[in-house]
């Protein structure tokens, strides 16, 4: 289903790409794989940015390897029109019981009760992503209703707020 999903977005993106140097925005879970891994799916997404001659903003899970564990994040990636990575935003304000389990450290047994629930790590802050000389404030899902997030992006010179959601 992963390649089929990318094929759908490829068709939609290439038929609607208005001109070079535009921005194409996909939803929160548009890339249902770890985009940061070098494989055929990553190449397919990069090719869409190149062939559309547009910047591409999309959601994909991501991870960071640490010595003794791996952290997972709900992320947005921004590709330049040449397919290179401009930046990544990791969602800061996570949804309880959907993206993390509250009080897990105090009550370890909760993890067994809610097996299968996401256990994402929160991002480090609201830092704009840059494409050319433009600064985008990216919000994922219900972060779009948080006025503090929008204010923080504005304080950091974001010119456009983009909310990706499913």
Regions found by a protein language model. Give the residues of each.
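Enzyme catalytic cores with a strong preference for nitrogen-chemistry domains
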Residues: 1-166
């Amino acid at each position: 289903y992963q390649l089929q999903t990318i094929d759908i977005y490829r068709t939609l993106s290439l038929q609607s790409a208005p001109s070079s140097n535009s921005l194409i925005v996909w939803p929160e879970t548009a890339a249902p794989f770890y985009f940061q891994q070098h494989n055929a799916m990553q190449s397919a997404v990069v090719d869409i940015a190149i062939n559309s001659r547009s910047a591409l903003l999309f959601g994909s899970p991501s991870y960071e390897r640490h010595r003794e564990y791996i952290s997972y994040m709900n992320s947005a990636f921004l590709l330049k029109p040449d397919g290179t990575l401009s930046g990544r935003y990791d969602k800061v304000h996570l949804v309880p019981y959907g993206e993390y389990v509250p009080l897990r450290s105090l009550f370890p047994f909760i993890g067994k009760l809610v097996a299968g629930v996401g256990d994402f790590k929160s991002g480090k802050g609201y830092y704009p992503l840059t494409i050319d000389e433009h600064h985008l404030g990216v919000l994922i899902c219900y972060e779009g209703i948080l006025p503090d997030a929008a204010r923080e992006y504005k304080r950091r010179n974001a010119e456009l707020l983009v909310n990706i959601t499913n």
